[in-house]
């Protein structure tokens, strides 16, 4: 029997660099689906087409990441143009019965619309709350913000099933989107413990200091890296010269952050690696004594789950972060939570406290690792991923061939008691 064919479209990152999308594609392939992924090209991922582990990956041309309203208009328009052309070609060449669109932005449903007329079903994989994301970047609720709200509503309107990364995003789908609870599934973005596991620390990575503070994520002000630099400066002003900060990752403001580091005279205390291979990333974080998440307190960060938190936990690292709803849900006792009001000083004091209490660092690290192993690892998300696809295939209805009752995905995963969302 032919495998059910699906197409996954992601606009903002290449695959397999986008870890969530790659884990989804791999898990679906391993469970009997014929998977094709369409994504942009990026540094290190310039090949237009390749087959990786049985998964066809197509990459379209992409403009440089935008940082203005006009820039976003050009970037998204360019992406939609190529996505539509590639999708038409993939449909004619390989075929697909379900399309999965990953945001941001909330625009992939536009690619799905003409194919829905052919009976194709659409799954919305909700990575980021776009209205909140826009406001966190620009602090405005003008015309562009209202367009984001409108596009989100349309995305929900034309989605047959929604996959949310956490309970807060599921609530958005139920309240702002008005979806049936049976059509919304929580698929958390936990680390894959088969590949993301601690390695022995390498003292050479501590830059000659006794203690290393680790960070991984996107290099942008929105991620709170400016706060982290102020934290490092505060620690330096306290007379500490025994602590080094290593920040891992690429992003639109990497050059600006390096310049800020230079301006604050922190070059001997802070370094930015840029984007590096996962093996090197894991070695640095495994060497770190404390890992940090300086995401700024705001509505976007409050309702979002950051994969870095669970990666730190998987590597048995104690964490310092601000007290945010989903961050606390993920880390629980594996983290200390800095006061939102006294951002820099309290964040710094939490780091210093952990530095001075190695037994507590070990206890918190063990607690975090155990929580990931028992609840948050990617393996616990696969069941809901499969349930979401089982649900959408029960809705699939091809006008020339009524397959709803015979599709293997529907019969093996389609019962409501097996496909119900979990929290």
Task: List each model region and its residues.
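Membrane-proximal helix-turn-helix segments that form the acceptor-binding/catalytic region
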Residues: 88, 107-118, 143-162
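Conserved donor-binding/catalytic core segment of Leloir-type glycosyltransferases
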Residues: 7, 205-232, 246, 385
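N-terminal subdomain of nucleotide-sugar transferases
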Residues: 1-45, 49-57, 404-408, 412-423
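Carbohydrate-associated surface elements
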Residues: 168, 190
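A short, well-ordered alpha-helix in the C-terminal region of glycosyltransferases
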Residues: 353, 360-375, 384-387
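Nucleotide-activated donor-binding/catalytic signature segment of Leloir-type glycosyltransferases, i.e.
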Residues: 248, 255-282
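Nucleotide-sugar-dependent
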Residues: 223, 279-284, 293-313, 320-333
């Amino acid at each position: 029997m032919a495998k059910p064919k699906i197409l996954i479209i992601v606009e903002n990152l290449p695959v397999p660099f986008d870890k969530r999308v790659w884990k989804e594609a791999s898990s679906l392939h391993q469970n009997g689906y014929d998977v094709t992924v369409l994504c942009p090209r990026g540094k290190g991922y310039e090949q237009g087409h390749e087959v990786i582990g049985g998964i066809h990956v197509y990459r379209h041309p992409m403009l440089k990441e935008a940082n203005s309203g006009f820039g976003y208009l050009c970037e998204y328009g360019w992406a939609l143009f190529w996505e539509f052309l590639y999708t038409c070609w993939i449909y004619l060449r390989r075929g697909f019965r379900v399309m999965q669109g990953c945001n941001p932005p909330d625009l992939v449903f536009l690619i799905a619309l003409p194919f829905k007329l052919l009976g194709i079903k659409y799954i919305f994989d909700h990575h980021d709350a776009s209205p909140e994301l826009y406001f966190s970047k620009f602090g405005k609720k003008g015309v562009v913000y209202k367009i984001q709200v409108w596009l989100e509503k349309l995305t929900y309107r034309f989605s047959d099933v929604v996959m949310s990364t956490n309970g807060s995003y599921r609530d958005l789908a139920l309240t702002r989107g008005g979806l049936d609870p049976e059509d919304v599934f929580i698929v958390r973005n936990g680390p894959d413990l088969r590949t993301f596991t601690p390695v022995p620390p390498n003292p050479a990575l501590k830059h000659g200091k006794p203690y290393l503070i680790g960070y991984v994520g996107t290099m942008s002000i929105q991620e709170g890296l400016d706060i982290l630099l102020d934290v490092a400066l505060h620690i330096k002003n306290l007379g500490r010269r025994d602590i080094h900060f290593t920040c891992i990752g690429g992003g639109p403001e990497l050059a600006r952050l390096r310049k800020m580091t230079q301006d604050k005279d922190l070059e001997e205390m802070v370094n930015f690696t840029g984007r590096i291979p996962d093996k090197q990333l894991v070695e640095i974080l495994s060497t770190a004594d404390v890992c940090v998440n300086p995401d700024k307190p705001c509505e976007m960060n409050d309702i979002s789950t950051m994969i870095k938190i669970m990666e730190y936990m998987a590597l048995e690292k104690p964490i310092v972060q601000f007290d945010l709803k989903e961050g606390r849900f993920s880390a629980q006792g594996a983290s200390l939570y800095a006061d939102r009001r006294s951002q820099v000083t309290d964040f710094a004091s939490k780091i210093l406290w952990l530095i001075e209490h190695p037994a507590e660092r070990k206890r918190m690290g063990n607690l975090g690792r155990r929580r990931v192993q028992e609840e948050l690892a990617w393996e616990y998300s696969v069941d809901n991923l499969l349930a979401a696809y089982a649900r959408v295939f029960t809705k699939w209805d091809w006008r020339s061939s009524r397959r709803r009752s015979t599709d293997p995905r529907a019969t093996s995963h389609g019962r409501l008691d097996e496909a119900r969302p979990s929290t």
